[in-house]
């Protein structure tokens, strides 16, 4: 099928689709290996209807090409939407040269690789990162696509690939059940997804708001970060890391650093960050008035978040994104063939698990031979 693509001039160092679309932020972009292009469904601008958006990058001529399949208005509307989605108002070169390198020598060894934080739908971000709990990118990708294909609405089919909308909270509560989600492989996350969807439906009704995204954006109005995080953690299955991912990638709080096992490792290994008793006491006092935070927050990890913000400044979340990608390697996510390629870190851990299993087997066989020798 032939489409007329719009064009946007952008240097690969400022935006590299391969380093952004399937690297642990968004989980529904599909890579077409034959056509060298990405596709997904998204709402364009203020529209409530989903359109299929196709992107490809002409790296040699530094051009981003784009087209929408469906009723999204015009090409200018899509271009404006993509500039907001990719946060192209923020210059990575400026952040490297004027913010990060002067304050962190580690960035002097790096250069902009087009890794930036996306401006995503907060509702989809919330559910996606509930799926991320104790999970890897490949499985999160499968889960997010499963939610759409089973409980979203079919938008269209292109070259045999079916494209669906991301289900709203109402659609999840009316179409999904915990049992069905468990059957689809969501495990204990099934309960969290259903209960979060139900709570959001009730929260919207109380606030007289119909849109999931509009409601989640409304909790930021005149609110401090700690209060927004407290509210997000009131949803079942949402801890500090998931809440911080929603704040950073869904609510555009650029200074927030979600601290997971990878970021914690970077902080301790490369920056020697650790919390002493006084640090923990101060944080404990700080959260006295926030009962959910007091219960859910790991104070040592929260100290890491604060120290990294102090080091990297108002775009600390972006700096974390750069080092996170460097740490784990890329991923190729969903493809039009139906396969989901794995990132470097997943392959390393799987190899380690195989080696450990082989070593354990050798030990068991060795023990068995010793026992047999004793019997003889």
UniProtKB/Swiss-Prot annotation:
Kindly list the positions annotated as binding DNA. 134, 139, 189, 262
Q: Name one GO molecular function term.
A: class I DNA-(apurinic or apyrimidinic site) endonuclease activity
Q: What is its main location?
A: nucleus
EC number(s) reported in the record:
3.2.2.-, 4.2.99.18
Outcome of swapping residue 241 to R: Diminishes both DNA glycosylase and AP lyase activity
Binding-site residues for 8-oxoguanine, renumbered to this chain: 258, 260, 320, 324
Which residues are the active-site ones? 241 (schiff-base intermediate with dna)
Keyword Phosphoprotein recorded? no
The similarity comment for this entry is: Belongs to the type-1 OGG1 family.
Extra information: Present with 3690 molecules/cell in log phase SD medium.
- Write the protein's name: N-glycosylase/DNA lyase
Q: Which gene encodes it?
A: OGG1
């Amino acid at each position: 099928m032939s489409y007329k693509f719009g064009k946007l001039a952008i240097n690969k160092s400022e935006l590299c689709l391969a380093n952004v679309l399937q690297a642990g932020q968004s989980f529904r972009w599909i890579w077409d290996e034959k056509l060298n292009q990405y596709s997904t469904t998204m709402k364009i601008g203020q529209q409530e209807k989903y359109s299929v958006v196709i992107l490809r990058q002409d790296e040699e001529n530094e051009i981003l090409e784009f087209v929408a399949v469906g009723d999204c208005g015009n090409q200018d509307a899509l271009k404006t939407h993509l500039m907001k989605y990719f946060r192209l108002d923020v210059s990575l070169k400026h952040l490297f040269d004027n913010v990060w390198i002067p304050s962190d020598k580690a960035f002097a060894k790096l250069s902009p690789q087009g890794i930036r934080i996306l401006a995503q739908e907060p509702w989809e971000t919330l559910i996606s990162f509930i799926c991320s709990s104790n999970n890897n990118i490949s499985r999160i990708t499968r889960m997010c696509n499963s939610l759409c294909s089973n409980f979203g609405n079919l938008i269209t089919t292109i070259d045999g690939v079916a494209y669906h909308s991301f289900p709203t909270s109402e659609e999840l509560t009316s179409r999904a059940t915990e049992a069905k989600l468990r059957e689809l492989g969501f495990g204990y996350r099934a309960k969290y997804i259903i209960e979060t969807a139900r709570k959001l439906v009730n929260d919207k009704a109380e606030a007289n708001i119909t849109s999931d995204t509009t409601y989640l954006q409304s909790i930021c109005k005149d609110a401090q970060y700690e209060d927004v995080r407290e509210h997000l953690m009131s949803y079942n299955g949402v801890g500090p890391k998931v809440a911080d991912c929603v704040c950073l990638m869904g609510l555009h709080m650029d200074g927030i650093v979600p601290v997971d096992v990878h970021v914690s490792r970077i902080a301790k290994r490369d920056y020697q960050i650790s919390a002493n008793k006084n640090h923990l006491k101060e944080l404990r006092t700080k959260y006295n008035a926030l009962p959910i935070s007091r219960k859910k927050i790991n104070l040592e990890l929260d100290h890491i978040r604060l120290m990294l913000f102090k080091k990297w400044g108002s775009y600390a979340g972006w700096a974390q994104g750069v080092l996170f990608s460097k740490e784990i390697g890329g991923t190729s996510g969903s493809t039009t063939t139906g396969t989901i390629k794995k990132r470097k870190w997943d392959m390393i851990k799987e190899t380690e698990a195989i080696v450990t299993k082989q070593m354990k087997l050798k030990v068991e066989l060795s023990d068995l031979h010793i026992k047999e020798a004793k019997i003889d």
